[in-house]
């Protein structure tokens, strides 16, 4: 373990990379907590789902919880160790915290909609689900390795690709008017993950600028090989989750769509052709910031999530 002997105070008035402040401001302005989303409004819709749909939903959210836990406790801290500026380190600490909020959010969904025994069964399932455990181990292996740029590649794939086999389901239900408040919460998570993937991809591209052309080619090959390994595993995971639902093909297209986005965050061209990444328009509409009238996606306001604003009052404000 490395023991610090000296820490310098961070000075936000002397910034080496303006992107650090830009992303810090975006993340802090996007701040939210699950307690502000009225998940209990989804109880009637939850009760209309079949037992199989309920089990699928709980398993999907359990898998997402595992990925958020990895990113919170291992992934973002591993990237912090490679930060080039204190401001980058601060942004990554914010990312780490919000991943903990995301993990907490799924527990809020569980405690609101589900019976404890059903949730316990899903967590037990997650420990024995081979594709889920394999992708978790792949992430841990790269986060615990010594190559900073490879860590960033793995992190972008987690943020911009691996989450989306799970995100598909609440968007599907939302497109059919079910679990709409849960979908509001998931959109908040997706909004965060989009910024995380963009920022870490940006830092990766900055890192490429200072390595040799040969190293750049090596890293590109590594990224493509890792993506295909993760993609094959994600197909297996999605088949285990969605195989009996009839939704597997739609989920597969969503995977290709987001794999291409992950590559673009790294500065690479899309890999999967348009016909493989043709997402159901209803899912894309559900992903839209304006998909649900209950929620203002960018401002964090709306009927489902409201932060009060303070305003000074005068004596005559109280004359009724």
Predicted regions and their residues:
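Non-heme di-metal
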Residues: 1-320
């Amino acid at each position: 373990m490395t023991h610090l002997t000296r820490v310098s105070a961070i000075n936000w008035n002397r910034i080496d990379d303006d992107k650090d402040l830009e992303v810090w401001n975006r993340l802090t302005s996007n701040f939210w907590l699950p307690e502000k989303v009225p998940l209990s409004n989804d109880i009637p819709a939850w009760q209309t789902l079949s037992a199989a749909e309920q089990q699928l939903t709980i398993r999907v959210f359990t898998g997402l919880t595992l990925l958020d836990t990895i990113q919170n406790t291992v992934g973002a801290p591993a990237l912090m160790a490679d930060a080039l500026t204190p401001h980058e380190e601060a942004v990554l600490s914010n990312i780490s915290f919000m991943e903990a909020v995301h993990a907490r959010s799924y527990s809020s969904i569980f405690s609101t909609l589900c019976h404890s025994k059903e949730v316990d069964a899903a967590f037990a399932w997650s420990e024995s689900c081979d594709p889920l455990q394999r992708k978790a181990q792949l992430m841990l292996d790269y986060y615990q390795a010594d190559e900073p740029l490879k860590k960033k590649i793995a992190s972008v794939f987690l943020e911009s690709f691996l989450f989306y086999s799970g995100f598909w389901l609440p968007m599907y239900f939302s497109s059919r008017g079910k679990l709409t408040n849960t979908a509001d919460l998931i959109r908040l998570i997706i909004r965060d993950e989009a910024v995380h993937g963009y920022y870490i991809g940006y830092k990766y591209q900055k890192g490429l600028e200072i390595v040799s052309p040969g190293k750049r080619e090596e890293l590109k090959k590594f990224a493509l090989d890792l993506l295909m390994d993760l993609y094959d595993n994600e197909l297996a995971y999605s088949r285990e989750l969605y195989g009996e639902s009839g939704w597997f093909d739609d989920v597969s297209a969503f995977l290709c769509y987001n794999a291409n986005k992950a590559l673009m965050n790294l500065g690479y061209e899309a890999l999967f052709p348009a016909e493989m990444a043709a997402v159901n328009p209803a899912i894309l509409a559900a992903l839209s910031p304006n998909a649900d009238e209950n929620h203002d996606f960018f401002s964090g306001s709306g009927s489902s999530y409201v932060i009060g604003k303070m305003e000074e009052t005068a004596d005559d404000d109280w004359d009724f």
